[in-house]
């Protein structure tokens, strides 16, 4: 009686091993992400003084209860002193000064800041981030960072779990290679780029995977794609536009048939919404850090700015001319070269199955 049961136990062992491995992998990813969350102080990412100011006083500031003031003759909002630019960035570009200088500011006292969102970003992210506002500015920012990291893990993990085995491996490899090192740095931050990157990747991966799935898996993947589109459209104008770019790419990657009508409808609606969102923002992605305002420009010009910024944007993922902090921490050398080598090796390996459809 024990003999017939032995094969069953043998067949179950690989499944249990895979399940245990998946659980350990998820735990490791969560632990690594939370380590990124607490590894840097408030104000440590590009324009974070702008983002924390917008988090405390989301637009429209006249209706959110924020105190309005003036600074240097310009309209300003009142935020905790610890979030004012002179304190939250006191260590930026100063390699001889640690972030301890930020502790000299108080969470109790208020200070005016000119760094707040006045139409530069779509509605959604800052309004949601405002829900994390509390007495301690450090805890508020860390809580938002942790949420953004767990959101990415949950959404992208669901897509990987629902995708077919072949695509599951491809998505996992692409995600890891493309986002190391800079991608994970932003995902585990409070910058709207966290939602933008999670959303655009989720939209592309889930939509592609859904065209190759059936039943509940397909429904789940379409739902993940929709969630990604919402994140992209509520975080940045450029990520909203990239939904259109992704749709065009998928049109070449997936053969057109009646079967993919639901995915095609979602892609078209998301693309139209993304273009509309981008046209209503005041600042193109490549110009926020430099302070170049393109308010009043046509949406065609804004579209051109976003597309022309793509090469530098992609090179930045491997740390080329781009690093943590306010881009004042260099990844040039081992990190950038190593990441570039991995990307080139992966591209060379992928050429084995290249087709004209994929080239287009």
Stretches found by the model and what they are:
Residues 143-166:
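Transmembrane-helix motifs of polytopic, lipid-linked glycan transferases
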Residues 197-213, 228:
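Specific aromatic-rich, kink-prone transmembrane helix
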């Amino acid at each position: 009686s024990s003999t017939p049961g032995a094969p069953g136990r043998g067949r179950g062992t690989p499944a249990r091993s895979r399940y245990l491995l998946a659980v350990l992998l998820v735990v490791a990813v969560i632990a690594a992400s939370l380590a990124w969350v607490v590894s840097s102080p408030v104000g440590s990412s590009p324009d974070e003084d702008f983002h924390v100011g917008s988090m405390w006083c989301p637009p429209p500031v006249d209706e959110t209860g924020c105190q309005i003031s003036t600074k240097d003759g310009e309209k300003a909002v009142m935020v905790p002193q610890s979030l004012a630019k002179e304190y939250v960035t006191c260590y930026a570009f100063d390699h001889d000064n640690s972030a301890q200088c930020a502790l000299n500011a108080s969470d109790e006292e208020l200070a005016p800041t000119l760094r707040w969102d006045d139409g530069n970003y779509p509605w959604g992210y800052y309004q949601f981030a405002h829900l994390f506002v509390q007495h301690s500015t450090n805890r508020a920012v860390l809580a938002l960072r942790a949420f953004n990291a767990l959101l990415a893990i949950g959404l992208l993990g669901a897509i990987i779990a629902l995708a077919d085995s072949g695509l599951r491996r491809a998505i996992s490899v692409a995600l890891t290679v493309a986002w190391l090192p800079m991608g994970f740095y932003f995902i585990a931050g409070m910058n709207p780029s966290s939602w933008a990157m999670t959303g655009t990747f989720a939209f592309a991966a889930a939509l592609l995977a859904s065209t190759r799935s059936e039943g509940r898996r397909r429904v789940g993947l379409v739902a993940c794609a929709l969630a990604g589109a919402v994140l992209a459209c509520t975080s940045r104008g450029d990520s909203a536009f990239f939904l259109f770019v992704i749709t065009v790419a998928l049109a070449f990657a997936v053969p057109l048939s009646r079967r993919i009508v639901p995915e095609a409808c979602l892609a078209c609606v998301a693309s139209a919404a993304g273009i509309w969102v981008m046209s209503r923002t005041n600042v193109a992605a490549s110009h926020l850090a430099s302070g170049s305002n393109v308010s009043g420009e046509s949406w065609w010009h804004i579209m051109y700015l976003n597309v022309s910024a793509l090469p530098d944007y992609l090179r930045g993922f491997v740390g080329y001319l781009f690093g943590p902090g306010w881009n004042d921490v260099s990844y040039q050398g081992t990190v950038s070269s190593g990441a570039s080598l991995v990307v080139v090796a992966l591209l060379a390996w992928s050429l084995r199955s290249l087709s004209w459809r994929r080239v287009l």
